Amino acid sequence: MAAITAALIKQVREDTGAGMLDVKKALTEAEGDVARAKEIIRAKGIAAAGKREGRKAQEGTIASKVVETANGETGYAVELNSETDFVAKTPKFVEFTEEVLGYAVDADANSADELLEAKAGDTTVKLAVEEAAALFGEHVKVGQFAKISGEHVEVYAHKKSAEMPPSIVAMIATDKACLLYTSPSPRD
């Protein structure tokens, strides 16, 4: 069994985002094997995330992107929700939202359901979101998804405040328009 040092605990914490005690328990259970400890943490995190699934996740952020296509342009927008704005505004959450958007673009997804089944590295977006829920310690879900195509597409992203990521995104194509917003809606 390898010695479980503070440096080893720190390394696994940075890689997984898990708490110090959880990392120490996982390393002890894995007899110092870092890869096995990470797998134990991931499995426990996904199990815990499943328990949070019934909670409301209505805070969040929206990422959007316009890409050129053979017939013009296509705009994609993905809303990723968490339980609190505290999590939604963290750089890691915003970065993960951008990653999910990238998976939508790569898969040329047409709906949130298609996005959840899309490849995310060596897994699916659905499993990546479950792993993110374990990392953030909150229920995380893909909220709204929109795709719009036309000769030309423009996107407007609105922030509720300067420190928050976009919470309202409007996309307009030469002959169509759509609007995404995080809850509560501007109409509430």
Functional labels for PLM-detected ranges:
Residues 2-183, 187:
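N-terminal assembly/interaction segments in proteins that build large macromolecular machines
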